[in-house]
């Protein structure tokens, strides 16, 4: 969250709401009934954590309202009734969801004006393009969204229910094989950090399994040190081979290709030449090269393929929103 015209968000926090697992023992401690974001994260040991956004779509409106309240009043410190708001939504978000979002903004927060934009379209704007295909992968969902001259092509959008959270779960599982135990919602957050700091994507997975001898260490919050080797690239490999976790789905490369193939034959060349990665789950080192290699193998042999992985892609949806909301034409 942040302000239009800024080049980076002012507030970045996980969309988590935590509630105490046990009622307070200490009298007069003024215990809150719910914690949001980083505070929920830091007190995660005594809380049960809930994610109100599942697979990119809001499923728990009461908790979502708490998150928005926290955003306005604690993070940005603004009065929502004084500022127009730009919200984003997942591609193919049900219309009822958008209506509910609008209702809460106007009725609960009294915003003077609002607009809802599709996330992937904003990522493309942030990359300075109006035509291309965005492979956006966050925590709960991945999408491939072909966009032509600024308009998303809904018939060719594909959704893949495979994203950051699944990779974290998989890493929890393969670390268990090494004899480390991570089970609670709080420990999942530790594993997520391991994933973000140490994972990478192999250009050739089979070869990497043979060659890989490098081991890295990671210090847990309690001081214990764990060692991680092939797990580093085995974890995000799931993006290209969902069958590893028993999912019957196409990988992100094949989903991108399938999306392009659902588009008019005349615009495919423009899409192949502008494949833009966005979202936190595309932050793994090696992802652009691997994506390029896999799509080259699927595409017609003379096709020029370009995979763009902007350095700020973790926040490119937000940056695109900042650009859009600061345009004078948009404000009218």
Swiss-Prot record:
Query: Mainly localized where?
Result: cytoplasm
Question: What's this protein's name?
Answer: Actin-42
Q: Could you tell me where this protein is found in the cell?
A: Cytoplasm, Cytoskeleton
Quote the record's miscellaneous comment: There are at least 13 actin genes in potato.
Q: Report TM segments.
A: none
UniProt keyword Nucleotide-binding, yes or no: yes
The UniProt entry, under PANTHER family, shows: ACTIN
Give the domain of life: Eukaryota
Q: Which family does it belong to?
A: Belongs to the actin family.
What keywords were assigned to this record? ATP-binding, Cytoplasm, Cytoskeleton, Hydrolase, Nucleotide-binding
Reactions mediated catalytically = ATP + H2O = ADP + phosphate + H(+)
Q: Name one GO cellular component term.
A: actin cytoskeleton
Q: What does this protein do?
A: Actins are highly conserved proteins that are involved in various types of cell motility and are ubiquitously expressed in all eukaryotic cells. Essential component of cell cytoskeleton; plays an important role in cytoplasmic streaming, cell shape determination, cell division, organelle movement and extension growth.
The molecular function terms of the Gene Ontology recorded here are: ATP binding; hydrolase activity
User: Recorded E.C. number(s)?
Assistant: 3.6.4.-
């Amino acid at each position: 969250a942040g302000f239009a015209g800024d080049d980076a968000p002012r507030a970045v926090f996980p969309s988590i709401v935590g509630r105490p697992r046990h009622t307070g023992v200490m009298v007069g401690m003024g215990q809150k009934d719910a914690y949001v974001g980083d505070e929920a994260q830091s007190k995660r040991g005594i809380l049960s954590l809930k994610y109100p956004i599942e697979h990119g779509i809001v499923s728990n409106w009461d908790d979502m309202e708490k998150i928005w309240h926290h955003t306005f009043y604690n993070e940005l410190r603004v009065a929502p009734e004084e500022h127009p708001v730009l919200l984003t939504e997942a591609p193919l978000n049900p219309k009822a969801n958008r209506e509910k979002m609008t209702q809460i903004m106007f009725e609960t927060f009294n915003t003077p004006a609002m607009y809802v934009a599709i996330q992937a379209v904003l990522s493309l704007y942030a990359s300075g393009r109006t035509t291309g295909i965005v492979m956006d992968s966050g925590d709960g969902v991945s999408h491939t969204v072909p966009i032509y001259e600024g308009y998303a092509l809904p018939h060719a959008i594909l959704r893949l229910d495979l994203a950051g959270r699944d990779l974290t779960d998989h890493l929890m599982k393969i670390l268990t094989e090494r004899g480390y135990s991570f089970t609670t919602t709080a420990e999942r957050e530790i594993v997520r950090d391991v994933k973000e700091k140490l994972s990478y994507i192999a250009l050739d997975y089979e070869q990497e399994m043979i060659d890989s001898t490098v081991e890295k260490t990671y210090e847990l919050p309690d001081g214990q040190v764990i060692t991680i080797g092939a797990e580093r690239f085995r974890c995000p490999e799931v993006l290209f081979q969902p069958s590893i976790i028993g999912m019957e789905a196409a990988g992100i490369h094949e989903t991108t290709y399938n999306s392009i193939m659902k588009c008019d034959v005349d615009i495919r060349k423009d899409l192949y030449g502008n494949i833009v990665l966005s979202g936190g789950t595309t932050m793994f080192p090696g992802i652009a090269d691997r994506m390029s290699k896999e799509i080259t193998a699927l595409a017609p042999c003379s096709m020029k393929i370009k995979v763009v992985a902007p350095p700020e892609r973790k926040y490119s949806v937000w940056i695109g929103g900042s650009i859009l909301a600061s345009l004078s034409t948009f404000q009218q």
